[in-house]
Amino acid sequence: PIGAYALGIEYGLVNWSTMLNNSPLYQKQDMVIRDEDYCRKNGLMGLSDKQLRAYPNAWRSWPRNYGGNYGDHSDIPLWNGLARSLNTIAIRVGDLVGASNIFNFVYNTLQLNTLDPVNDVGLAQMVMGSQTHGVTPTALAAAFQIFYDGQYTTPHLYTRVLDRDGNIYLENNATSYQALTPDTAYVMNRLLKNVLYSSVGTAGGRYPNSNGMESFGKTGTASDEKDLWFVGGTPYYVTAVWWGYDAPYDMTKTLGKQQAKTRTCVMAWKALMEQVQADLPYKAFPSSAGVVER
């Protein structure tokens, strides 16, 4: 959501209620996306796209949603597609925004500088996370902080160090700037709240019980369940949780598919936030006067 959805709203291309079709952006008959498994099994990997057009089964529809389905081809509102983490909806928004616009925003504005300027400028990389090297939890948490008030602050491990007399020994001057308008930040905040509070959200009901304070979040799962993610935000903190192995391993073998998808990272985040925020006074997310709510 830090790229496609956020910029779609920022540019005025989509809004909370925009209806989008829950189906692949490219159909098999469009002959745009190769079916790598079919090509590999049939010795077609070395053919050019032009040569491959002689083989209708060498192509596939794209993208699929988590679990392998291609959507039901119905029109659904944007908020619902984001809450359910539907690739079919996210890719359609990303296609409206443009992969290069998304890359420039996340690489330059949000400083996700582990991305590859040559190989990561595409919808699969920018919307579905299929990057060359990926991003770190620290960088991802820093990026999601823009859904508080639109401001980005460079990550840092300390603010200042004092000596025993109270004098400043070290000071870390972090850089802050406006990455999104407050209006866009607030709409995105409310959209991501649905992930935790809506009955259709991928982490529905798994928000921290912290003195009535609201939260927002986003689940993330690799298609092979070798990387599980959750990024959650409260009025005090943004936290990114990654669950996996140094040597990639299919975690459904030990967790089960549904548990791997929704009950690992988000539950770890929930438990952490409930402890960290236990004694903090109530705080609300800032609203934006420019957003009309009904």
Regions found by a protein language model. Give the residues of each.
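A penicillin-recognizing enzyme superfamily signal
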Residues: 2, 14-15, 80-84, 133-294
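Extended, hydrophobic alpha-helical segments in both membrane/secreted and soluble proteins
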Residues: 1-9, 89-90, 102, 106, ...
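Soluble periplasmic/extracytoplasmic beta-strand elements of cell-envelope proteins
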Residues: 21, 127, 240-242
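Thr-Gly-centered strand-to-loop micro-motif
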Residues: 92-93, 130, 217-218
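Intrinsically disordered or highly flexible coil/loop and linker segments, enriched in small
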Residues: 87-91, 99-103, 111, 115-116, ...
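Primarily short, surface-exposed interaction patches in extracytoplasmic proteins
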Residues: 103, 108-139
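Short acidic/histidine-centered micro-motifs embedded in hydrophobic/aromatic stretches
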Residues: 22-23, 105-109, 160-161
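Conserved catalytic neighborhood of penicillin-recognizing serine enzymes
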Residues: 13-102, 123, 166-194
